[in-house]
Curated annotation (Swiss-Prot):
Coiled coil start-end: 215-252
A biological process from GO: T cell receptor signaling pathway
Organism field: Mus musculus (Mouse)
GO CC entries: actin cytoskeleton; immunological synapse; membrane raft; mitochondrial inner membrane; mitochondrial intermembrane space; mitochondrion; plasma membrane
Superkingdom of this protein's organism: Eukaryota
Record-listed Phosphotyrosine modification sites: Y124
Gene designation per UniProt: Stoml2
Reported consequences of knocking out the gene: Embryonic lethal at the preimplantation stage. T-cell-specific conditional knockout does not alter the normal development of those cells but decreases their responses to stimulation through the T-cell receptor.
Entries under Pfam families matching the protein: Band_7, Band_7_C
Name the UniProt record assigns to this protein: Stomatin-like protein 2, mitochondrial
Length: 353
């Protein structure tokens, strides 16, 4: 009779706990086992036994023996990791934005005695603590930081729960925020902000592309000008080298011609040949005067070709006259002069004809 009364009292307390919390605790999901003297406790469970209404001991997994009527199983605690869905709730951020947020809580009972006698419903208590802690932590952050510092927010909630739930024999392993719902207007403003940020990035990237393009074009023009100047420089160097080679070749040819002419002048009748050449060039120069419309200076009697030739020969003779050695034959000189005069007269007759 006492056992039945005790079981009835335990069932009444359990129903009262369920009604107060509004949910069925995980630890009493399968009900309380009866005292059958010999009991087998499953793995990862802890059965709290009371003797005559006072805590007696905690049954370990395996075979256990109880005294009928005196001993009663009062609580059954699961030592497995428990997952609890934290209901959606409203919270206000630091910048006065109201959010709807929910989460998932992972916890484990570390001390069955504290979990049984420290709080009426440990799971419900931890859920309420998680909600209040989450509201408190969200009030410390602005809306932007809520999305950026999600991991740190979860860690702060876990630390706050563990500090408060230590006396309940419960340890919070982790807390994860599932969904964050913002008001429609705030969502629209956030979307506009995101679009503005994207447009800003696009503008920056476009300007950077334009700058890089301008730099590349300028660099290309610079390289083209450098190459063009180098090519022009090389062309001028080659042209100068060619002109220098041509001048040198002309100088060498002229020097060779002068050398040959000097050698020819030293031969027999060389002076006469030179005089003849000078006379030809003199007459040829005056013959071109009639063809060109130029203002020139003419001798006093341009029609007298013989006098012009004689004058040219006199100039050449004055330039080429050299002192004669004392032993030179004067008769030979006179003969040479006469021969030269004869040649000039013949040349005059040829020109006049």
């Amino acid at each position: 009779m006492l056992a039945r009364a005790a079981r009835g009292t335990g069932a009444l307390l359990l129903r009262g706990s369920v009604q107060a919390s509004g949910r069925v605790p995980r630890r009493a999901s399968s009900g309380l086992p009866r005292n059958t003297v010999i009991l087998f406790v499953p793995q990862q469970e802890a059965w709290v036994v009371e003797r005559m209404g006072r805590f007696h001991r905690i049954l370990e997994p395996g075979l256990n023996v109880l005294i009928p009527v005196l001993d009663r199983i009062r609580y059954v605690q699961s030592l497995k990791e428990i997952v609890i869905n934290v209901p959606e709730q409203s919270a206000v951020t630091l910048d006065n934005v109201t959010l709807q947020i929910d989460g998932v809580l992972y916890l484990r009972i570390m001390d069955p005695y504290k979990a049984s006698y420290g709080v009426e419903d440990p799971e419900y208590a931890v859920t309420q603590l998680a909600q209040t802690t989450m509201r408190s932590e969200l009030g410390k952050l602005s809306l932007d930081k809520v999305f950026r510092e999600r991991e740190s927010l979860n860690a702060n909630i876990v630390d706050a729960i563990n500090q408060a739930a230590d006396c309940w024999g419960i340890r919070c392993l982790r807390y994860e925020i599932k969904d964050i719902h913002v008001p429609p207007r705030v969502k629209e403003s956030m979307q506009m902000q995101v679009e503005a940020e994207r447009r800003k990035r696009a503008t920056v990237l476009e300007s950077e592309g334009t700058r890089e393009s301008a730099i590349n074009v300028a660099e290309g023009k610079k390289q083209a000008q450098i190459l063009a100047s180098e090519a022009e420089k090389a062309e001028q160097i080659n042209q100068a080298a060619g002109e220098a080679s041509a001048v040198l070749a002309k100088a060498k040819a002229k020097a060779e011609a002068i050398r040959i002419l000097a050698g020819a002048l030293t031969q027999h009748n060389g002076d006469a040949a030179a005089s003849l050449t000078v006379a030809e060039q003199y007459v040829s120069a005056f013959s071109k005067l009639a063809k060109d419309s130029n203002t020139v200076l003419l001798p006093s009697n341009p029609s007298d070709v013989t006098s012009m030739v004689a004058q040219a020969m006199g100039v050449y003779g004055a330039l080429t006259k050299a002192p004669v050695p004392g032993a030179q034959n004067s008769s030979q000189s006179r003969r040479d002069v006469q021969a030269t005069d004869t040649s000039i007269e013949e040349l005059g007759r040829v020109k006049l004809s």
